[in-house]
Amino acid sequence: MIVTAILSGVILGFFVNQIRAIVIASAKQDLLEQAQIGLDYTAQDVRVSANADDSNRWPDANAPNPTDQYSWQSNASSLILATGAQDQNHNVLFDDPSKYITAKDNHIYFISNGTLYRRILASTITGNAAVTTCPEAVATSTCPADKTILQNVASFSVQYIDGSGNQVVPSSARSILLNVTLSKHEYNQDITATYAEQMVFRNDS
């Protein structure tokens, strides 16, 4: 009787541990899929952009430094993309058509309170379909909320790579290497997943 009870307890404990391991593995896989989707989105934005800007080219009333509307910086944790402006029909807009120099919006990827956001700073060129975005707390109909890319972000890093594979200043980069770690505390433990992705710029004017 005692032996049977002990064996039953051992078997039950084994199955409980197995189920717990499966659930944790599933949660980790979910985090990994979220990380991949988020970086795929960001990498696609890199692919259609001309380059990284060292700082924002358009003023932002919600910039990191409230007294400096040009205080965004491309660095190890923030990325400023120079992305071609388009009209409502997805036609490219040009600052200088004779030299094929396209107008550029800024797409800014940054972390705030464990969330990766994308902010748009729209070019002032006539006909631009893009709209400047704002933090959700101050968003309006004319300045919609920044797009949420990823939540539960434990770390997010950006590396700026030239054609020879060397790390360079943002504006000299030929490609961008993104790395993100997501983390959630579930089942009395921290569950994490890390994903990295590299993408080359389109590199037009």
What name fits each language-model region?
Residues 17, 45, 49, 119, ...:
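Phosphate/oxyanion-binding loops and surfaces in catalytic or ligand/nucleic-acid-binding neighborhoods
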Residues 1-51:
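Aliphatic-rich helix starts adjacent to a transmembrane/signal segment
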Residues 31, 35, 109, 171, ...:
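Aromatic-acidic/polar surface patches that form glycan- and anion
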Residues 51-69, 73-75:
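Short amphipathic secondary-structure patches
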Residues 68-164:
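Type IV pilin-like appendage domain
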Residues 130-133, 138-205:
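Short linear sequence signals and composition-biased patches located at protein termini or domain-edge surfaces
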Residues 34, 73-74, 173, 194:
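A generic fold-level signal
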